[in-house]
């Protein structure tokens, strides 16, 4: 550390005085549903109500000089996080901040340019989960290499590696370098190790003032202590100012701080030296229990159910925050501490600030602007961001490679579809379609940028707070990564398609095509990236994306020729990059070509009509009157295109690209981690009458922090002494289910494969849990605690498991996974369900099918009583920012498992992680209560206080590598464990928490696994285990297996899951509104773009393309519905599938059925905005038939979208797959290539399997079949007859044969014969293989069949079972 000091020291210090922080006062808010959002009077009334301002931090003051550490303590909701955010100069989101904050001698405004030196580590762990630990830390340390290096280091790379290795070693996670960071859905390092990665990333900023918000969450006691010791050392050596808020801080941690500041309801009740805090509280009459955590004691004094008061002070002690503050304000200590507030005006502060500025200047690259808070050069920022961009791509190989492979397959299919397109008029549609698709598909693939933008945003906002790099560096890195990737993507597509289609066979033409396609793809990627950056919510961004994509496709020039665009929307063409690209590739292809007219485009043709002098082109744009051959340039001119525009358009596309990049940089630069008040309950509008106390309670907790608030639900603090009375079993206790089974595991080994070989995560672990036993599973971070729980609960799907896991001495029953409750570390719930709904859902699905519904619901009431959740039972689960708090969510997680009446045992993984001491004690108190009435409970726990640890009966202690170091009784206040370790050379010092002591001991160099295996306790434990297994096996099983994998029949599952999804969608107004808005806007766009189509030959194409455009409502809506589907699937796979709640078919059916009512509404709004606008037949028979098909299509594309999502690992992957699937369906529907011209390899099977074929067929028949056709002047084939014959005589044979569907308008003329290609729409449809009117109803029926069958099986995995 000393080697890393710069010549000038960065000793800054921070002082604040009269600091008050206010935010919008909101403890509960109503959540609208689909119907209530239209209650305009109510909404207007609420919007006019002036929002109440709530004081979050009230008149705080303090000073942390260089080299000092301040511990900020307070219950959740006290304002600790808000205080730290404001001290870290992060004020965005707060309504009002008053008072002074000084950094050295700088004001808060002056300090803004030193953003990277005043940093905050938040409680959230925001990372790219697929990157490894080393890649994550490499990036952070690269961005903070000083320009002037220490004398002992020669280059930036050496400094970066030295810094990285030091930080990894200091946090004890150097062994995880090649492991993914992971998150709740991506497997990676353990929770404690991930928290240490977060700490290292913050330390890598090499700042001067550090604010740490609950940064020991998820760390075991030993690692937490080591981390604070490390922070203490760095603070001392480097002269840092460290401000820390912690929950469940042990006394060893507490003693490392210089000062302590206690907040309660935002009021500062104590600020002073650490050693004076406890005597100060004792002096006011609050009793301290020997061995208790002093930090918890300091925050408990305002909690009536937790504090203990000296008898002689019962009538005089301060009862609330105001009285406590008032008492503190009168003390000499307050006056002494106030002397520090002049520090900013002192010579020391001025000198320190001057040195700080010089040191930062020396660190900063000279090429950066003077006011920039960054450290390394812009080139280094971009270079490092490019490396990370490729690491991100390569770390998720499936999402990167599979779409590329599918893209190539798509190219082969496309090439085969357009294979060897003729170089005459019959090939014009082929080539135009192929060129349009080349431009379109690559643009559609770019839509994934919107999803990717929102996935990356939280990490980028965090890095901006750390001043690691300029947002422009990230944007340019993406561009640099785009170029080779897009070049590869386009090349994989262009090579097969171009040469298989038989486009112009010259190198120059191919290179032009390739360059134009790359340019358009780059431009569209930049466009969608800009859209993603511009919006704060994904729903809004995807709504705009869907509409914009429809508009751009429609106005490319392929669906609507340039000359037929209506003026009110034709301007879209001129701002459309796709239009410029399409004109360029089309002009590149047809320039200089000679195109003979053939088949239907040559009138007359066939036997006896071979003289071109008496033939003419028909239906070909740009064809001169009477000509039988057309040049490519004439064809282009007919489309209002010109070859001279190719390179002009190329330049215009790149100008658009530059504009989109500038917009992306601008919007990305404005991303930030919003501070401000959050954390309030959300009440569904339909439950308003049941929860009025929640919404209007004036006394609801005052802490709108990012943490939970002890009172924000309007409930009294849990832990009422009456509840914990042991005077006899309560009514609740008597209603709780009791376990009778013995659960054992013996010789359990779990091995996984890693790049470096097999890795043993559990090594011959054994133990048991009996009814009435509360067992603790402990160990350092990464010791295998969660892994053991996963293996015991049968949740592992990979790796090799050996050993035995038995219930009552027998193999696990079929019903084990639903008979054992498992509360995972992460609280995964349906966010739009209420607490009661979540509990009832679990009870109804997981309790035995022999239990009546009434009794199941009564048991839910029992659990709500037990967990004291009455006041929040009708509030939405939501998120921690808007919904249940961390502790309330944890209670709900436990409740969801309890209501299932687990008949074997309950597993809990880190139930107290992230909670304050009081909340943690309440959770363990509940578990103790459960064990006391006969439940078997096994809990992993990280940082138990002495009083918490004393609640457990037994302990299984693991060391690194999943090795057992102790299994047995805890003893009274840990006496048995202490005796064991004392006897083996590690006695527990007096007044030391035994839990912290033993984890500290087993984390050392001594092999405690060997000590355990040689101990008499191990021998006795093995004998007891064998006895338990034999004894249980000799008796009838205590828990009878009903033989059912699921507790309820499939019909019940279907009803309950569908009901939950219906309720969820009813409340999901964003999703429903966006879906409806997309249909309304798309319908209007389609309708007004094809306004009142006429009856010319060209209008027949317009009929076709307006219907074809209707298909393109699907991509936008699918992109919107898939993330919702994947969120639900993640909930299902993370918890509900593992606990055997219900079958996948119930999951899929529930999602499908819940969508149906909204799909009907969507069909109605699209139909009403489109059908009559384009001028389709108004007769009820045809209009009704079209509506039926439109409705069926809504069902089809929803099924397709959900099926794609069901088989893809994530939302970005799904967005990449969508265009490929939709493109294949579009290809073979008979529009791009008519049936007769589809290659035989596809024609006889894929054409008939394509639902879009029948969709297009039915809609075309009903709208176009009976329409008369009237050719415009330029649409007639005009030619002369030989030897003075009349037109009728000359064409007699032709009109009987190939021209039977054409219309000769002047049969008696002898020259200038005028032939119209078609007489009715039916003649045109005949060329599309739609030969009769009944085809319409045939195809409509087949569309309905596809709608029913378009839903696919949800992917699922089997769990691993132990090998004996």
Swiss-Prot record:
Q: How does it sit in the membrane?
A: Multi-pass membrane protein
Q: Does the keyword Acetylation apply?
A: no
Q: How has the protein been applied in practice?
A: Cordycepin has antitumor, antibacterial, antifungal, antivirus, and immune regulation properties; thus, cordycepin has important value in commerce, medicine, and scientific research.
Q: What happens when the gene is disrupted?
A: Does not affect cordycepin production but significantly increases the cellular accumulation of pentostatin.
Explain the induction of this protein.
Answer: Expression remains unchanged during the development of fruiting bodies.
| Record: residues binding ATP | 779-786
Residues annotated as glycosylated: 152, 214, 610, 689, 711, 739
Q: Name one GO molecular function term.
A: ATP binding
Q: Does the keyword Nucleotide-binding apply?
A: yes
What keywords sit in the KW lines? Answer: ATP-binding, Cell membrane, Glycoprotein, Membrane, Nucleotide-binding, Transmembrane, Transmembrane helix, Transport
Membrane-spanning parts = 435-455, 483-503, 508-528, 540-560, 567-587, 650-670, 1076-1094, 1105-1125, 1146-1166, 1185-1205, 1211-1231, 1245-1265
Cellular compartment(s): Cell membrane
Which residue range or ranges hold the ABC transporter domain?
Answer: 42-290, 737-985
Segments of this protein annotated with the region Disordered: 697-732
- Spell out the InterPro entries in the cross-references: AAA+_ATPase, ABC2_TM, ABC_transporter-like_ATP-bd, ABC_transporter-like_CS, ABCG_dom, ABCG_PDR_1, ABCG_PDR_2, P-loop_NTPase
Q: Which GO terms describe its cellular component?
A: plasma membrane
Which family is this protein grouped under?
A: Belongs to the ABC transporter superfamily. ABCG family. PDR (TC 3.A.1.205) subfamily.
Q: What else is known?
A: Cordycepin and pentostatin biosynthesis coupling is an important point of metabolic regulation where pentostatin safeguards cordycepin from deamination by inhibiting adenosine deaminase (ADA) activity. ADA is not inhibited until cordycepin reaches self-toxic levels, at which point ADA derepression occurs allowing for detoxification of cordycepin to 3'-deoxyinosine.
PANTHER family tied to this protein: ATP-BINDING CASSETTE TRANSPORTER
Q: What does this protein do?
A: ABC-type transporter; part of the gene cluster that mediates the biosynthesis of cordycepin (COR) and pentostatin (PTN), two adenosine analogs with related bioactivity profiles as both mimic adenosine and can inhibit some of the processes that are adenosine dependent. Mediates the pumping of pentostatin but not of cordycepin out of fungal cells. Decreasing intracellular pentostatin releases adenosine deaminase (ADA) inhibition, allowing ADA to deaminate cordycepin into non-toxic 3'-d.
Protein name, per record = ABC-type transporter cns4
Which gene holds the coding sequence for this protein?
A: cns4
